[in-house]
């Protein structure tokens, strides 16, 4: 897989971030550092580590519950507009719009149960 970021952006709704939940954050940091040479930087949220060199924005964090899975985040212009559109198309809201230092996010579930996030920059 070529990671030179030569792929064109079609419509601006790109995968812009991913998160990997961990039962043991330090252990997974060691794993991904050894496997992919990823470098980590402490995030602004406690227990959150930004992945610095994974091609796109990524994070490693402490699991909030045993069922928590990896999540991709798609960039959108407006959380409210896309949450509404997703609900009209049969999506469920897992987590309403949240604000963090860099922007806003919400977590949704598609009609077949797949969880994904949407992201709006500040």
Predicted segment positions?
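Core segments of cupin and vicinal oxygen chelate
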Residues: 12-57, 102
């Amino acid at each position: 897989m070529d990671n030179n970021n030569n792929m064109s952006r079609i419509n601006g709704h790109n995968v812009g971030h991913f998160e990997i939940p961990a039962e043991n954050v330090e252990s997974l940091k060691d794993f991904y550092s050894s496997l992919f040479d990823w470098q980590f930087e402490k995030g602004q949220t406690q227990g959150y580590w930004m992945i610095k060199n994974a091609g796109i924005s990524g994070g490693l964090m402490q699991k909030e519950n045993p069922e928590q899975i990896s999540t991709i985040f798609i960039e959108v212009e407006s959380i409210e507009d896309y949450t509404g559109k997703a609900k009209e198309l049969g999506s469920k809201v897992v987590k309403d719009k949240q604000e963090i230092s860099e922007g806003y996010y919400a977590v949704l579930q598609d009609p077949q149960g797949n969880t994904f996030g949407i992201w709006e920059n500040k």
